Amino acid sequence: MTVDQRTTAKAIMPPVEMPPVQPGRKKRPRRSRDGPTSVAETIKRWAELNNQQELDPQGPKKARKAPAKGSKKGCMKGKGGPENTRCDFRGVRQRTWGKWVAEIREPNQQSRLWLGTFPTAEAAACAYDEAARAMYGPMARTNFGQHHAPAASVQVALAAVKCALPGGGLTASKSRTSTQGASADVQDVLTGGLSACESTTTTINNQSDVVSTLHKPEEVSEISSPLRAPPAVLEDGSNEDKAESVTYDENIVSQQRAPPEAEASNGRGEEVFEPLEPIASLPEDQGDYCFDIDEMLRMMEADPTNEGLWKGDKDGSDAILELGQDEPFYYEGVDPGMLDNLLRSDEPAWLLADPAMFISGGFEDDSQFFEGL
């Protein structure tokens, strides 16, 4: 097939139209941010129209319908964020990632306007109210009254509307009313904040008073008063306890205020309590319940190594253990040399080579062991 034939075939064949990718679905045109179809220009146009109808009562008026009540998010059941089903604000819904969005439909059942994304549902509801007042005028259905919207949400919504309306599309009267409502709400918030601050300050002051009361020297002196001696009456009839308590309290206060470096330099801190009574002042003549300290000291000086003397009859007839005997006492029939060997031996007694010692128990004859039984 030559080149001329190909050219002739292309001229004869009709052009082939490509079918759309998704037949039956219309592509919704996007609104530009700055063009005549933007959200800001649309709200501004409706606000000017409402303003003209209010200021010119004799002019031609177009019938306006009140906005629909809505279907309580019937189409959003099971969709959106976790809190979307519990949200009762008009024109507000939650995204799956937690953000809140606001939308409003133009009057006369026209298309919806996207008002923006907000961090809270209240802020989105306030933005919807501002747009509803601008587009529907006195017939607008709002989420909050003009004096019942949260102050923080009003500020966020006003900032969003100002960004959407760079030219100040709202009328002066509407802006003034919204500003007054916001200022009243802010005043309420400030009043509540001031009252909360006052209550917090009062609580802190009460706590500081309690702490200062606990650290007063008078309270410390009363607590530590049982450690002091009973008050003595002077010759002129005055009480000596006053002077002692003042001195004692000053010592305690100085002890508490003294830095740790001062205590380290002195080697020890000041004595908070009075010195203990000496041993010589202990009660005497208590019968068998007390002991003689002088006698105990004399005994310790006479026998510093606690060996003692063994006194008594050397023939073993008087076998009573008494302090001051000449030699130690042994049981009758027991070999003293064997006991000394047992005590001086390095090996245990059960490892010794003489098993007869365990049988006889150290006695010369078994009859001596069973004699006293």
UniProtKB/Swiss-Prot annotation:
Induction: By heat shock, high-salt and drought stresses. Residues 1-87, 216-270 are annotated as: Disordered. Residues 88-145 bind DNA. The keyword GTP-binding does not apply. Keywords: Activator, DNA-binding, Nucleus, Stress response, Transcription, Transcription regulation. This is Dehydration-responsive element-binding protein 2B. One of its GO terms (molecular function) is DNA binding. The lineage of its organism: Eukaryota, Viridiplantae, Streptophyta, Embryophyta, Tracheophyta. Belongs to the AP2/ERF transcription factor family. ERF subfamily. It is found in: Nucleus. It comes from Oryza sativa subsp. japonica (Rice). Transmembrane segments: none annotated. GO terms for biological process: positive regulation of DNA-templated transcription; response to heat; response to salt stress; response to stress; response to water deprivation. InterPro entries: AP2/ERF_dom, AP2/ERF_dom_sf, DNA-bd_dom_sf. Transcriptional activator that binds specifically to the DNA sequence 5'-[AG]CCGAC-3' of the cis-acting dehydration-responsive element (DRE). Binding to the C-repeat/DRE element mediates high salinity- and dehydration-inducible transcription. Involved in drought and heat-shock stress tolerance. Residues 61-76 have a biased composition (Basic residues). Its main location: nucleus. GO terms for cellular component: nucleus.
